[in-house]
């Protein structure tokens, strides 16, 4: 900092003198020192930072700019897993990342539906309600799940156990495998998954893992040519 900044300032002043500028206004300061970085697009990057504005770290910290891998709409366990995966990308190998992803997949499948579901806000529940078809055409997926939840809670007379989803409610939703007994691929709920409806065994853990964990990582891994799983090739076939 004490060497580079004065040198850069002298270069700017030399340039200003060369072009006969009225005043030298250009300033540059050191921001981060990192040993690794991944750029997915302009102004979208991850840095493995050891020094930030003169503050030196004992362990590197991730700096993310324009990267939406960790969002509030992502299930909480996946947010932690994604952060750890990003750290591993900065310090490990592709094989180590793939192994970590498989470990995460195994742990993910042991979690209850409440922990792997997507958090959302239920706006306009009544707007999309339809008497004959439960929900209207074009209903957002989490609202469709909310209307299905309300319908089957009432159908199974579970109103005393589960509160119906109202406008503005904080909810969660998850995908279901088809075919299933409600003939739908989604269900929403408030806090407790509606096990009494009989759809627990249809929770699509593979699709949930794909959308909440793998898809956010793929955008970053693609930028460095890494994969989320081991791929077979002719060379590996003969070894």
Per-segment meaning from a language model:
Residues 1-239:
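DNA-dependent DNA polymerase catalytic subunits
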